[in-house]
Amino acid sequence: MATSKVLLSNVLFVFVCFGICSAARTLLTLEDRVNLHVGTVVGGYGGGGGSGGGGGGAAVELGGGGYGEGAGGGEGAGAGYGAAGGGHGGGGGNGGGGGGGADGGGYGGGAGKGGGEGYGGGGANGGGYGGGGGSGGGGGGGAGGAGSGYGGGEGSGAGGGYGGANGGGGGGNGGGGGGGSGGAHGGGAAGGGEGAGQGAGGGYGGGAAGGGGRGSGGGGGGGYGGGGARGSGYGGGGGSGEGGGHGGGYYP
């Protein structure tokens, strides 16, 4: 009788131990699954404005990073922007400005027809294209990053742009265009204002010896841009027929 009680007690003890181990293993498995899914953060993208609207918010890069597709705009819309790795900056409609990319550059948006100054965004490490002016717009210049970027754009009344840190900005084409101002080590002389007529011929800088030409015709509006260093900033857009905003913003 005593032997049966001892045997039964041992069997019950073994079952209790198995139950405790099984419960602990289940809890650990659930915790691992939760930890596997938590922390996956996806970068969003910013929206464009409506008629006369401003820019959207900033795209975010966390870990593997999201993407930075910039939104286009309607009439007078604001800018989009790109996250690290590039993407397109948002183009404006009438009078809209554009946003720049981050580490991989990207395209800065240009001003539309009737717009004022459009601010094109430059890349932090990869340069990028500056914004171009539209018909009647006071053209948007592009700011380069560590690499050179292109300056102002085309169109009647388009102005020049600022050069990058190591490269000059190109001048605008079309009537009343001004040249692009040079960068720290680059060329690109400022465009002249000697009356109306043929557009400016501002040159590409891109080095200590680089020089830009001077153009005849009225001076256009210069622009400058901002890209984020790691995340993306955004460029503000102007209203229809008005001046644009400027780039900027830093989102770590």
UniProtKB/Swiss-Prot annotation:
It comes from Phaseolus vulgaris. GO terms for biological process: cell wall organization. It comes from the Eukaryota. Residues 231-252 are annotated as: Disordered. It is found in: Secreted, Cell wall. Residues 1-30 form the signal peptide. This is Glycine-rich cell wall structural protein 1.0. Expressed in young hypocotyls. Responsible for plasticity of the cell wall. GO terms for cellular component: extracellular region. The keyword Ribonucleoprotein does not apply. Keywords: Cell wall, Cell wall biogenesis/degradation, Repeat, Secreted, Signal. Its main location: secreted.
